[in-house]
Structures are given as C-alpha cells and as structure tokens.
C-alpha cells in the first residue's frame, strides 16, 4: 500500500528526519521511543491502544540520500511473527515546487490467520502510513497550491 503528500521542506530536510531512527517518535504513529538506535538498526517501542509497550526491531536495507530509504521489520522471534512473514517500508522524496513529494510504501506479507484478513491488514497499513504522512506534515507543514 502506498500514500503520498507534499510537505513544505527541501528533500534534504525531510531526509534528515526520515533517515534518523531517533526521530521516529516525532512523526511515526504509536512510537513512544526508539532504543539502541544506529543508522543501520534500531528498536521501536510502540504503544498499543490499551497502553501496552511492544518492541519492534528494524534494519535499514537501502538508502540513497536524499532520495530513498528502505527498512525491514525483523519479524522473526517477535510478537509480530504470528501474523507477518515479512514487512518492509520504503520512503521516497522528490523535489516538488519548493517542497518535497514524500511517498511511503509499506509491504506486509501476512502469515497464519492474517492471510485470511486482507482487508484488516490493508486498513492497518493505511492507518499507519497515513499517520506517518500526517506526522511529517505536522513537522514541516503542507505545501499549498
């Protein structure tokens, strides 16, 4: 699933935010903090709607500054292992009339019972990506016009 928006910032400014795992709590939904962050790997601590903390490990797969970054959710031996066999996120940035077109794509490969709930999986991914774009818009502002 993929969504996009245009923000009022240069691609380099957007890159500095999306490529720094420590900045995820400022714009990615449900992330309360990031632990053990390096440019190559990090752990998101997510808060469930019920207030329970869930840890999720990520690894940077590819990066082309300031154009594209991709990371993989390390689902094996995690709470997500029962519903996902793989999960990747890609963010691309393109200059656009004084701002930046930001496109976020998420690909989840469901496992187990989740294979039989494609609409729920897609709805969750849509909420996540839309929330991330809203977070970037809050940080940078939306490009008008």
Give, region by region, the residue ranges found by the protein language model:
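N-terminal glycine/threonine-rich, aromatic-flanked beta-hairpin/loop signature
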Residues: 40-44
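Hydrophobic ligand-binding cavity/cleft-lining segments
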Residues: 1-39
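A conserved amphipathic terminal alpha-helix motif
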Residues: 101, 108-145
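Hydrophobic residues on conserved beta-strands that form the core of alpha/beta folds
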Residues: 2, 102-103
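Hydrophobic-ligand binding "helix-grip"
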Residues: 25-26, 33-36, 51-101, 107-109, ...
């Amino acid at each position: 699933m993929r969504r996009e928006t245009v923000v009022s910032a240069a691609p380099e400014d957007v890159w500095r935010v999306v490529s720094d795992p420590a900045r995820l709590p400022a714009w990615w939904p449900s992330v309360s903090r990031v632990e053990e962050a390096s440019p190559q790997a990090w752990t998101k601590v997510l808060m469930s709607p019920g207030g329970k903390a869930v840890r999720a490990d990520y690894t940077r797969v590819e990066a082309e500054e300031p154009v594209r970054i991709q990371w993989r959710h390390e689902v094996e031996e995690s709470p997500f292992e029962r519903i996902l066999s793989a999960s990747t996120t890609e963010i691309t940035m393109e200059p656009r009339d004084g701002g930046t077109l930001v496109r976020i794509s998420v690909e989840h490969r469901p496992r187990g019972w989740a294979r039989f709930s494609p609409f729920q999986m897609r709805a969750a991914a849509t909420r996540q990506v839309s929330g991330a774009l809203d977070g970037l818009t809050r940080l940078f502002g939306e490009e008008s016009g």
